[in-house]
């Protein structure tokens, strides 16, 4: 059946966050998705922060439970589902994460339980260190080695990794480049280069990887899977992700951008 509801996009400022949380609490709004830059700022306004959202300090979904406002993170599971969807094995692999912004903690959390080694590199090293500290908390809980996460200077690269992920916004604007050298990955068809950006659907980061002969994936399926999880939180209904849904998203992206 149909659900009698409307999903709207609103541009807000930090001062608007409390009002939005209050509207969820009093039933004027049933559910909310939060995007960068407010995924962390919203936490202090909530009654309860759930699981991954607490570990990552990143909330992207709000809902009401017994007149209390709950915060969830669907990015981590959405990202993992996108890898499963693409038949990408990520357990016991070496991972290189580029960036340390709003969504990066969710990507880090996805790998913490299973990766052999996780390297983080960011232009601002302090941000990478804060991210590592957050990750180390999860590692301690899982009783894994503290050396699982390592920070490397921007521009330097560790040994060949199995998955390289761009979590920065570089690539949103046409012809933007990360200015990182990956020529030693040439003809390595087992390495996955993953860009969280899904519009444009192929950034220069992915184009270059394809030219080198690497596997590539953009963030479109992560976007869909995290949305499915959020929808279930709100409605207890888990929509099917099929070719028609993907086609509708492609159509919407052309209109929106």
Predicted regions and their residues:
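Conserved S-adenosyl-L-methionine
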Residues: 112-117, 211-215
